[in-house]
């Protein structure tokens, strides 16, 4: 998992509430359990004018010019700004995979669906909760200023605007540790590999009958 420390990046606005996981990555693209390759189909039904299916050459599909993420000014964005209850709907870890593969490192919203929120942390994507008033202000600034960038410092738990205004956000120490060090659940377990092996050896000596056969 990629570590997250600090970024300064373009912000792309998605001015919709209750964006569900089927909108983030439609169900027909869930046939793979690899974490990569989902980016071209993120927001597929809004992003393209035709209906997408696995195996299609996305470079030849007609883009929807009215979809915000297709606008040239937001190309290369690594921060997604959106509205409340983002990531609602069915549980699918493919949703944060698709956002990550698209190029997003962080998502800012007033609220997130619980399962999606947890899945973000497991996959190196930082979900930031701000108040609706703060999100409204950011939307206005993003839309008024082409190339608008925000700076996110995870260690300090701050988000800074181009004018120098700073917002703070909450995150548990455990989640911060994992993101700062690029540790998913497997990586976190492997940090304790020596202790695990020592425990297994001690148990093998004290209860050898469990290891016969």
UniProtKB/Swiss-Prot annotation:
Keyword Nucleus set for record: no
Keywords, in A-Z order: Amino-acid biosynthesis, Branched-chain amino acid biosynthesis, Leucine biosynthesis, Lyase
Record GO terms (molecular function): 3-isopropylmalate dehydratase activity
Record bears the keyword Hydrolase: no
Pathway it works in: Amino-acid biosynthesis; L-leucine biosynthesis; L-leucine from 3-methyl-2-oxobutanoate: step 2/4
Coiled-coil region(s): none
GO annotation (BP), single: L-leucine biosynthetic process
Catalytic activity: (2R,3S)-3-isopropylmalate = (2S)-2-isopropylmalate
GO CC, alphabetical: 3-isopropylmalate dehydratase complex
Record-listed E.C. numbers: 4.2.1.33
InterPro entries associated with the record: 3-IsopropMal_deHydase_ssu (IPR004431), Aconitase/3IPM_dehydase_swvl (IPR015928), AconitaseA/IPMdHydase_ssu_swvl (IPR000573), IPMI_Swivel (IPR033940), LeuD (IPR050075)
Role played: Catalyzes the isomerization between 2-isopropylmalate and 3-isopropylmalate, via the formation of 2-isopropylmaleate.
Quaternary structure, from the entry: Heterodimer of LeuC and LeuD.
Family: Belongs to the LeuD family. LeuD type 1 subfamily.
The name this protein goes by in its record: 3-isopropylmalate dehydratase small subunit
Gene name of this polypeptide: leuD
